[in-house]
Amino acid sequence: MGLTISSLFSRLFGKKQMRILMVGLDAAGKTTILYKLKLGEIVTTIPTIGFNVETVEYKNICFTVWDVGGQDKIRPLWRHYFQNTQGLIFVVDSNDRERIQEGAAVLQKMLLEDELQDAVLLLFANKQDLPNAMAISEMTDKLGLQSLRNRTWYVQATCATQGTGLYEGLDWLSNELSKR
């Protein structure tokens, strides 16, 4: 009985811990997103060599977000962050039509990893404020998301510099992860 009340109390008032891995090609906006969520402001960023890790508290959930550099030479290191990842945020520059196929290949390869088989996928279609940005339907098609089987995924249009769509994405992520 004490355990039941204790677990109910912790569900109502405690913070649930979530491990989130945020990856994507270089210059997609991962670090800008991380610090917009953490600090509520835009910070000047430089290309991430290695990783940034921050705790973001939102709606009674404590997200530990790992932002890992996206340059092609760093990508093989991503696998070191896969273990115990519950949610995967893949950030795509919606305006970068020249590299969307590269992004699709990187994403598809990563989703084959055993350690990520249970992770839900949130795709941030970033830089939606730019005039040449791909629509969500076009991006979904070019990334091959419709072919994903046995994977819970969602695409959220975002603009990291304005903060648009970021919390809507976290809402989806927290709803999906709290079902587990």
UniProtKB/Swiss-Prot annotation:
<dbReference type="GO" id="GO:0043197">
    <property type="term" value="C:dendritic spine"/>
</dbReference>
<feature type="lipid moiety-binding region" description="N-myristoyl glycine">
    <location>
        <position position="2"/>
    </location>
</feature>
<dbReference type="GO" id="GO:2000377">
    <property type="term" value="P:regulation of reactive oxygen species metabolic process"/>
</dbReference>
<dbReference type="GO" id="GO:0106274">
    <property type="term" value="F:NAD+-protein-arginine ADP-ribosyltransferase activity"/>
</dbReference>
<dbReference type="GO" id="GO:0003924">
    <property type="term" value="F:GTPase activity"/>
</dbReference>
<dbReference type="GO" id="GO:0006890">
    <property type="term" value="P:retrograde vesicle-mediated transport, Golgi to endoplasmic reticulum"/>
</dbReference>
<dbReference type="GO" id="GO:0006886">
    <property type="term" value="P:intracellular protein transport"/>
</dbReference>
<feature type="binding site">
    <location>
        <begin position="67"/>
        <end position="71"/>
    </location>
    <ligand>
        <name>GTP</name>
    </ligand>
</feature>
<dbReference type="GO" id="GO:1990583">
    <property type="term" value="F:phospholipase D activator activity"/>
</dbReference>
<dbReference type="InterPro" id="IPR027417">
    <property type="entry name" value="P-loop_NTPase"/>
</dbReference>
<dbReference type="GO" id="GO:1902017">
    <property type="term" value="P:regulation of cilium assembly"/>
</dbReference>
<comment type="similarity">
    <text>Belongs to the small GTPase superfamily. Arf family.</text>
</comment>
<dbReference type="GO" id="GO:0045197">
    <property type="term" value="P:establishment or maintenance of epithelial cell apical/basal polarity"/>
</dbReference>
<dbReference type="Pfam" id="PF00025">
    <property type="entry name" value="Arf"/>
</dbReference>
<dbReference type="GO" id="GO:0007173">
    <property type="term" value="P:epidermal growth factor receptor signaling pathway"/>
</dbReference>
<dbReference type="GO" id="GO:0000139">
    <property type="term" value="C:Golgi membrane"/>
</dbReference>
<dbReference type="GO" id="GO:0005886">
    <property type="term" value="C:plasma membrane"/>
</dbReference>
<feature type="binding site">
    <location>
        <begin position="126"/>
        <end position="129"/>
    </location>
    <ligand>
        <name>GTP</name>
    </ligand>
</feature>
<dbReference type="GO" id="GO:0050807">
    <property type="term" value="P:regulation of synapse organization"/>
</dbReference>
<protein>
    <recommendedName>
        <fullName>ADP-ribosylation factor 4</fullName>
    </recommendedName>
</protein>
<dbReference type="GO" id="GO:0005525">
    <property type="term" value="F:GTP binding"/>
</dbReference>
<dbReference type="InterPro" id="IPR024156">
    <property type="entry name" value="Small_GTPase_ARF"/>
</dbReference>
<feature type="modified residue" description="Phosphoserine">
    <location>
        <position position="147"/>
    </location>
</feature>
<keyword id="KW-0333">Golgi apparatus</keyword>
<keyword id="KW-0597">Phosphoprotein</keyword>
<keyword id="KW-0547">Nucleotide-binding</keyword>
<dbReference type="GO" id="GO:0045176">
    <property type="term" value="P:apical protein localization"/>
</dbReference>
<keyword id="KW-0931">ER-Golgi transport</keyword>
<dbReference type="GO" id="GO:0048678">
    <property type="term" value="P:response to axon injury"/>
</dbReference>
<keyword id="KW-0449">Lipoprotein</keyword>
<comment type="function">
    <text>GTP-binding protein that functions as an allosteric activator of the cholera toxin catalytic subunit, an ADP-ribosyltransferase. Involved in protein trafficking; may modulate vesicle budding and uncoating within the Golgi apparatus. Part of the ciliary targeting complex containing Rab11, ASAP1, Rabin8/RAB3IP, RAB11FIP3 and ARF4, which direct preciliary vesicle trafficking to mother centriole and ciliogenesis initiation.</text>
</comment>
<dbReference type="GO" id="GO:0005829">
    <property type="term" value="C:cytosol"/>
</dbReference>
<dbReference type="GO" id="GO:0016192">
    <property type="term" value="P:vesicle-mediated transport"/>
</dbReference>
<dbReference type="GO" id="GO:0043066">
    <property type="term" value="P:negative regulation of apoptotic process"/>
</dbReference>
<dbReference type="GO" id="GO:0007612">
    <property type="term" value="P:learning"/>
</dbReference>
<dbReference type="GO" id="GO:0098978">
    <property type="term" value="C:glutamatergic synapse"/>
</dbReference>
<dbReference type="GO" id="GO:0045944">
    <property type="term" value="P:positive regulation of transcription by RNA polymerase II"/>
</dbReference>
<dbReference type="GO" id="GO:0005737">
    <property type="term" value="C:cytoplasm"/>
</dbReference>
<keyword id="KW-0472">Membrane</keyword>
<comment type="subunit">
    <text>Forms a complex containing RAB11A, ASAP1, RAB3IP, RAP11FIP3 and ARF4; the complex promotes preciliary trafficking; the complex binds to RHO in photoreceptor cells and promotes RHO ciliary transport.</text>
</comment>
<dbReference type="GO" id="GO:0099175">
    <property type="term" value="P:regulation of postsynapse organization"/>
</dbReference>
<keyword id="KW-0342">GTP-binding</keyword>
